[in-house]
Amino acid sequence: MQFSFTRSLLAVSLLTLAAGLAQAEETVRIGYQKYGTLITLKARGTLEQRLAKDGVKVQWTEFPGGPQLLEGLNVGSIDFGVTGETPPVFAQAAGADLVYVAHEPPAPTSEAILVPKDSPIQSLNDLKGKKIALNKGSNVHYLLVQALAKAGIPYKDIQPVYLPPADARAAFERGAVDAWVIWDPYQAAAETRLQARTLTDATGLADNHQFYLATRSFAKAHPEQVGAIVDEVRSVGEWAKAHPDEVAAQVAPLLNLPLDTAERVVKRQGYGARFISPEVAAQQQKIADAFAALKLIPKPLVIRDVVWTPPASLQTAAAKP
């Protein structure tokens, strides 16, 4: 009997130890891109310091664009990430079980339609029939839709060339496409290194919000971690807004950019992450409706169905100055 009790006690102890190790080894997996506040947060390490108090590690994974990042969320390789406005719309249309968590203020100058410096294209009207490179389903996809609508050009009257940023730049450099719709830092690099000319940025066409998203299961199981991430993003954004030169010096080597190009990127960003408001959700609904009308997504969407509602305690904390 004593042996049985001892064996049971040992089993309980081992289970307790295993549970403790599992908790100690818990990891939140975050996807980021070569743009935005997350790259500064990663460089400063403040999120790691905060979550370490709860035995949580942070694992960072870089993605070339929003569609690729959201695919990572969809297949479960990351828990949380940041994209522009359009990728979540395409992901929702494809059935991905993701939720909008927070957003940054608009940054319309940090995406643009670029043409080669000697291009005969002088206005949006000249885009008719042209080959235009873009990352399909990325934030700039909506910019292109809006720009064409402004010029009265049906989407079917251009030749979209869907390429990720690195391949799109190569095509742009060798003259295989007539224009390139792209975001920072690729935009700034093309402006400074290739002397690309800006046909238009998103001013008056698209807000270019950055959105923070999570898998629905992660947000449900770990609301405090989600809140901590958003809080740290907000804090580092406030710091970055007040110290743009320091941020540029910090991220320039991470982005493999000259300092003056990094400064251009930093100054065009929006800072100040907040949980999703009804107004921002309504703007996303307009984007979803536009893509549905063009049949670029297979069905109409309801954005509010995929907006995360944070616990009251997190909303109260976020409202404090």
What is the role of each PLM region?
Residues 1-10:
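Bacterial N-terminal signal peptides that target proteins for export
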Residues 9-18:
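Bacterial N-terminal signal peptides
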Residues 20-24:
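Sec/Tat signal peptide C-region and signal peptidase I cleavage site
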Residues 26-153, 161-162, 178-182, 204-206:
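Short, glycine-/small- and polar/acidic-enriched structural segments
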Residues 37-38, 107-113, 196-197, 208-212, ...:
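Small-molecule pocket liners
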Residues 86, 160-253:
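Pocket-lining segment of extracytoplasmic ligand-binding domains
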Residues 220-298:
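Secondary-structure end/capping motifs
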Residues 289-321:
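Conserved C-terminal helix/tail region of periplasmic/extracytoplasmic solute-binding proteins
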